[in-house]
């Protein structure tokens, strides 16, 4: 890795994001598409920008992301986690602010498996007493 680039891996649900921070003007490129074209939902775009806005580094870096797996929400969360880790790689003093906002901790919630005899993970067939 060159000194001009910082890297972070982020994960959320089944999505994995590889994030590269390079000095620049604030462009965010996800799978060779812009942030606005990749995410249709404004909430997903907001989630991706959260660590940058918190640390006031929005216009400071160009961000290149490759993300695979999961859905829209999981991918947005994975990118946020990856950006957070890359920012900590860039400047360790940002860790406390990012930790306080809850961006450093990997969200460990996963989909619960479906059980035999049930319709879904917890939904049971209707019970008939008689």
UniProtKB/Swiss-Prot annotation:
GO biological process, one term: translation
Keyword Iron: no
Transmembrane segments: none
PROSITE patterns, per database record: RIBOSOMAL_S9 (PS00360)
One function term, GO molecular function aspect: structural constituent of ribosome
Keywords per UniProt: Ribonucleoprotein, Ribosomal protein
InterPro entries xrefs: Ribosomal_Su5_D2-typ_SF, Ribosomal_uS9, Ribosomal_uS9_bac/plastid, Ribosomal_uS9_CS, Ribsml_uS5_D2-typ_fold_subgr
Family: Belongs to the universal ribosomal protein uS9 family.
Protein name: Small ribosomal subunit protein uS9
Organism: Pseudomonas fluorescens (strain Pf0-1)
């Amino acid at each position: 890795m060159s000194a001009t680039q910082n890297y972070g891996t982020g994960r959320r649900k089944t999505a994995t994001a590889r994030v590269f921070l390079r000095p620049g003007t604030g462009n965010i490129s996800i799978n060779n598409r812009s942030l606005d074209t990749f995410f249709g939902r404004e909430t997903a775009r907001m989630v991706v920008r959260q660590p940058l806005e918190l640390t006031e580094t929005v216009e400071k870096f160009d961000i290149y992301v490759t993300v695979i797996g999961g859905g829209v929400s999981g991918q947005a969360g994975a990118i946020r986690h990856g950006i957070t880790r890359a920012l900590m790689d860039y400047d360790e003093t940002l860790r406390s602010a990012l930790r306080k906002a809850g961006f450093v901790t990997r969200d460990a919630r996963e989909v619960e498996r479906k059980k035999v005899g049930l319709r879904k993970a917890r939904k049971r067939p209707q019970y008939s007493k008689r």
